């Protein structure tokens, strides 16, 4: 990389750090081009990204954005995965890492909190924001459905009693 290109590259990483509340730092040593392309496509469909970064430039960008605490995570062939939705991204990366042993999760940052590999794996087990919204809607609708059922039960029972009485006569 030319010296004149480095400030632009640092700027790109700074923008990712500023615009993405969730970042996972990975080691991609041993992944094939097709595997990286597959991961990128999967991430892109979920409005996330995968960027191979030069460690020194990623460290400079981290210091410029006040994320000094993640600078020590950059060593070896490193790539960052970034997204606005942390759970979906974590699920995708953890599942990809399980199926492709050459992708290693090193750590990350979610809402300015540094996470280790274990924390990211635990994050991937949580329900996504959309799943939580669906559960809340279901919980709000469930009582009303039960109330309707309870209110209808006496009239149905009364109708059965009357029908039974009418059939006897």
Curated annotation (Swiss-Prot):
GO MF term set: large ribosomal subunit rRNA binding; structural constituent of ribosome
Domain of life: Bacteria
Listed GO biological process terms: translation
Keywords: Ribonucleoprotein, Ribosomal protein, RNA-binding, rRNA-binding
One Pfam assignment: Ribosomal_L10
Keyword Amino-acid biosynthesis annotated: no
Protein name, entry field: Large ribosomal subunit protein uL10
Matching InterPro entries: Ribosomal_uL10 (IPR001790), Ribosomal_uL10-like_sf (IPR043141), Ribosomal_uL10_bac (IPR022973), Ribosomal_uL10_bac_type (IPR047865), Ribosomal_uL10_CS_bac (IPR002363)
Organism: Rickettsia akari (strain Hartford)
Protein family per UniProt: Belongs to the universal ribosomal protein uL10 family.
Cellular component per GO, a single term: large ribosomal subunit
Protein function: Forms part of the ribosomal stalk, playing a central role in the interaction of the ribosome with GTP-bound translation factors.
Assembly information from the UniProt record: Part of the ribosomal stalk of the 50S ribosomal subunit. The N-terminus interacts with L11 and the large rRNA to form the base of the stalk. The C-terminus forms an elongated spine to which L12 dimers bind in a sequential fashion forming a multimeric L10(L12)X complex.
